[in-house]
Amino acid sequence: MSDQSMSVTLLAIESSCDETAAAVIQDGNILCNIVASQRIHEKYGGIVPELASRAHQQHIIPVVAQALLEANIQKSDLNAVACTSGPGLLGALLVGVSFSKAFASALHIPVIKVNHMKAHILAHFIGDVKPSFPFICMTVSGGHTQLVIVRNYLEMEVVGETQDDAVGEAFDKTAKLMGLPYPGGPLIDSYAKQGNPLAFPFPTVDMPGYNYSFSGIKTAFMYFLKKNTAVDPDFIQKNLPDICASVQHALIDVLMRKLKRLVVDTGINRVAIAGGVSANSGLRKAMEQKREQEGWDVYIPAFEYCTDNAAMIAVAGYHQYLENDFAGWDLSPEPRLRIGGGL
C-alpha cells in the first residue's frame, strides 16, 4: 500500500457518455468538480455517439485546465491520473483514456483505470455521511439497473440486474411515446408531482431472484396510449400528470420490490442508490419511506453526484492508488466493462 502519510493528489477524467468532466482529489478530499454537458443531442432524441466524441475532443483540454485552476494545483503536484475506462460509448471513452494516458506519460506519473459503475457507487464517499461496509447499492441509470453488494472500496458483487431495458431507458422510452422531448425521464418526474400514481395501473413482471425486467411495462404502456388516444386524441394532454405519476409508480415499484427482497435475504440494511435515476424524486421518496417504516440506513447522493461527474472517478481512483492498482500503457476503452463477481 502507498504511504498515506504523504499527500496524494490525483486528476480524474470522465468521458463515458455526454459529459466531459474533470476533478482533482487530494488526500481523499475533492478540491474541484468541473462538468461540461452536451446539449447538442436533445434535437436528435438521444445520444449520437459520433457527436459525443467530437464534443469531448473540444471540451477536454479547457475542462482539465479549469479543474487545475480551481483546485489551485500545478501539474507537477499530481501523483496520478484516473480515468473512466468503461462501460460507456467507445468513441467517448477513447477521448478520455487517450488524453489521460498522454497527460500522465508526459508527467511521468501512473494512470489508473476506473470502472464507471463502481465510481457511481463510491460517490457516496464524497460527503460527510458515508455508509459502512458492507452495504447494498442499487445502481439506476440509462444504461444500467443493478443490485450490488459492496464489501469494500474495491470489492463489489452484482447479485441482480435488468434482463432487458435499464430503468432510465424505460423512463426515456415511455416519455418518447408521449411525445415528450429528450431526456424524458426528468420530465416524467416533474409532471408526476402533480399526478395521481394510482390513476392508471400497469402490469409488471416479477423476474426470478433479484433480476429486473422493464420491457413489459413499456409494451403495456404503448398499448395503453394507443387504445386511449384512439378514443380521445387529446387523452395524453388531458391526463399527462396522472399518466406520468402512474408509470413512474410502476417502475419504482419494480425497483423497490427487488431491493427489499435483497435486504431481507442478506440482513444488510445499509442501502444506497446511485446513478442518474437516483435523482428521481419518486425514488428518493420511496427510499426515505423505507428509512422511516423499516429502519433502513438509507444513503441518497447529492444531486450533483447522481449524474456523470469526475468527482466519483476521483474517489475510486484515489482508493485504487492507495492499493497500487495502476493500469499499463496499453490501457484501452472497455465499453462493456462490468463490475466483478456475481452474475
UniProtKB/Swiss-Prot annotation:
InterPro entries: ATPase_NBD (IPR043129), Gcp-like_dom (IPR000905), KAE1/TsaD (IPR017861), Peptidase_M22_CS (IPR017860), TsaD (IPR022450)
Protein EC: 2.3.1.234
Alphabetical list of PROSITE patterns matching this protein: GLYCOPROTEASE
Top-level taxon of the source organism: Bacteria
Cofactor(s) needed: Fe(2+)
Keyword Cytoplasm included in the entry's annotation: yes
GO BP terms in the entry: tRNA threonylcarbamoyladenosine modification
Reactions it catalyzes: L-threonylcarbamoyladenylate + adenosine(37) in tRNA = N(6)-L-threonylcarbamoyladenosine(37) in tRNA + AMP + H(+)
Residue numbers binding Fe cation: 116, 120, 308
A matching Pfam family: TsaD
Keyword tags: Acyltransferase, Cytoplasm, Iron, Metal-binding, Transferase, tRNA processing
Cofactor mode of binding and number, as noted: Binds 1 Fe(2+) ion per subunit.
EC supergroup of this enzyme: transferase
Primary localization: cytoplasm
Localisation per UniProt entry: Cytoplasm
Keyword NADP among record annotations: no
Record GO terms (molecular function): iron ion binding; N(6)-L-threonylcarbamoyladenine synthase activity
Binding-site residues, substrate: 139-143, 172, 185, 189, 280
Membership in a protein family: Belongs to the KAE1 / TsaD family.
Functional note: Required for the formation of a threonylcarbamoyl group on adenosine at position 37 (t(6)A37) in tRNAs that read codons beginning with adenine. Is involved in the transfer of the threonylcarbamoyl moiety of threonylcarbamoyl-AMP (TC-AMP) to the N6 group of A37, together with TsaE and TsaB. TsaD likely plays a direct catalytic role in this reaction.
Protein name per Swiss-Prot or TrEMBL: tRNA N6-adenosine threonylcarbamoyltransferase
Gene name, Swiss-Prot/TrEMBL: tsaD
